[in-house]
């Protein structure tokens, strides 16, 4: 064995340079052990070289693979981060700002609408002034609630109480049917109330109701039945409210601005005596005020008292003490009825001549509730007048000539306890 290795040793010493270059540099040793170790290590060195050469490739591939996978993983990570919030799915929160502006800027009105279903349920009625009460997206309904809220200076609780009472009253009374009724006596109410509608140049309409207190022929006949008088008065008011066309509204009125759904009222006291207060008038007037204050809030734009004696100025001065400024600012006493049309320059020609305009008298062109002629009432009235004349003649004959004539009671005594409070 040693001979063989001795024979091979010179061959390794004289090996070509190319063979040495292909392998690891050989360490030349004088001992056989080093040579044997070198010979044994050379194949391993080649394997290691091959392995070493292959490993970078694998590592490079792994590195490239890792580099390629990292963007993919990065792409997946943001997607996973964006999914949890799901902001688009939280629709209820996003829809809250879409609340109508008139509710967003008026929390009291918003609260009032929240109470509306309970109000309608407790009253058992869902109609006001010809407007079916719906939700906050319905302009006519919004306008109705605004009026009740304004009448109570923004107090939701008070507005709720008033609306509830008004709805219950409408359910019990059915004022719309009263306006269409034809059972009102012409003898009792003929010539006492009228309705006119005047048009502005821009097409806007002004509704005016006229109460001619001087037209009362017999106090007891007109005011004797208080309930009948109130029904007639409500019927006239309902006709005027219908002319406002609130159910046709397409826009919401400005809570703090002008309200186009209001009317003008004129109370004419021509030929009315203010010397004494008749109990029948007082009772009928008081009841009318109660009904109108509750059931017709914020429907009055202005109220004119015409042909009022100058001495009655104290009445209006006293009223300012008990009523709010918002109410009294709407009252305008005018001693001469012929000056009324001056208050409406753009409508002056449409007013009756007796009130300073150019139009015919109210009896000729104005509207009123349907009246029926009562044949028996006039006969009774004529008989009572004839009897009164006989009694008066008998008294004249029995009086001494020197005795002064006793003053007769004026039958046309009409004093409204609080005339300005007819409609708030």
Curated annotation (Swiss-Prot):
It comes from the Eukaryota. Heme binds at residues 213, 233, 267, 269, 303. GO terms for biological process: Golgi to plasma membrane protein transport; regulation of exocytosis. Residues 383-411 have a biased composition (Basic and acidic residues). It holds the Pfam family CRAL_TRIO. Disulfide bonds: none annotated. The keyword Membrane applies. It is found in: Cytoplasm; Endoplasmic reticulum membrane; Microsome membrane. The keyword Lipid biosynthesis does not apply. It catalyses: a 1,2-diacyl-sn-glycero-3-phospho-(1D-myo-inositol)(in) = a 1,2-diacyl-sn-glycero-3-phospho-(1D-myo-inositol)(out). Residues 1-98, 372-424 are annotated as: Disordered. Keywords: Cytoplasm, Endoplasmic reticulum, Heme, Iron, Lipid transport, Membrane, Metal-binding, Microsome, Transport. It is a peripheral membrane protein. Its cofactor is heme b. Residues 1-16, 50-68 have a biased composition (Polar residues). One of its GO terms (cellular component) is cortical endoplasmic reticulum. Residues 188-363 form the CRAL-TRIO domain. One of its GO terms (molecular function) is phosphatidylinositol transfer activity. CDD domains: SEC14. Non-classical phosphatidylinositol (PtdIns) transfer protein (PITP), which exhibits PtdIns-binding/transfer activity in the absence of detectable PtdCho-binding/transfer activity. Regulates PtdIns(4,5)P2 homeostasis at the plasma membrane. Heme-binding protein that may play a role in organic oxidant-induced stress responses. Belongs to the SFH5 family. This is Phosphatidylinositol transfer protein sfh5. It comes from Aspergillus fumigatus (strain ATCC MYA-4609 / CBS 101355 / FGSC A1100 / Af293) (Neosartorya fumigata).
